[in-house]
């Protein structure tokens, strides 16, 4: 079991903890598939709703909040039945807008894993307005059921009435619908190719600034992040922040980053290079490789 879970595992009922420990191996990064979840429910003799709420301390253990020191965990349950944990991330010494909220982390985890719809969001603190707006960008966002400890469950539409969303800006295919944009680039570099693929899957209906970041660690492992825009603009999730959240969930340190690549479209209304460099330089003393590509 990873050291970061030692404290949180003691907060779980013993039958659930005993069943969960084998899953918390060195490669565990917050994903539990539908079959594993069913086995946890059976072994613990708890309901699924009780298990998901009980797992929140495990999700919160993925957090990295050096500024607030407030650990928030979130669990997104997909239509597939799989669950995806996420946690808040803050960049030391940097402006607060670089922060990743736990709900954003969990949703990006699900998106990068190929999930097509979120049906439940379990979180240990009431979602802030920023996160409510971010969730509203998703497929059937208003119908996502929000679960909080010691509170009744409600749909997102209860927490965000009279919502402003993608349809107000004539966007009919929201976040989590598979979007593919093709770009022209001749490269044999696997890391650049990976970034190009993820840029093509990014979500930028308001600026067409399709973009992705890939980080490589000293052992050659890679961690990606895609741009995810929002109808309200400010809650958009930048690809570097998503990549750093991804890396953190995998229990890697920022000091292990040895290479960073940003690929973005030449036809976008904005460029993400400045914000991407700011975030990177807050955590790693390396230069950003910036590649601009033309849509096919």
UniProtKB/Swiss-Prot annotation:
Cofactor note: Binds 1 zinc ion.
Parts forming coiled coils: none
Binding site for Zn(2+): 101, 128, 131
CMP/dCMP-type deaminase domain span: 47-167, 186-296
Annotated catalysed reactions: cytidine + H2O + H(+) = uridine + NH4(+); 2'-deoxycytidine + H2O + H(+) = 2'-deoxyuridine + NH4(+)
Cellular component, GO, one term: cytosol
EC number of this enzyme: 3.5.4.5
Cofactors demanded by this protein: Zn(2+)
A biological-process GO annotation: cytidine deamination
Protein keywords: Hydrolase, Metal-binding, Zinc
Superkingdom field: Bacteria
Active-site residues, Swiss-Prot/TrEMBL: 103
GO MF entries: cytidine deaminase activity; identical protein binding; zinc ion binding
Positions with a binding annotation for substrate: 88-90
Family: Belongs to the cytidine and deoxycytidylate deaminase family.
HAMAP family: Cyt_deam
Quaternary structure (record): Homodimer.
Role this protein plays: This enzyme scavenges exogenous and endogenous cytidine and 2'-deoxycytidine for UMP synthesis.
NCBIfam families per UniProt: PRK09027.1
Name of the protein: Cytidine deaminase
Organism expressing this protein natively: Shewanella sp. (strain MR-4)
Organism lineage: Bacteria, Pseudomonadati, Pseudomonadota, Gammaproteobacteria, Alteromonadales
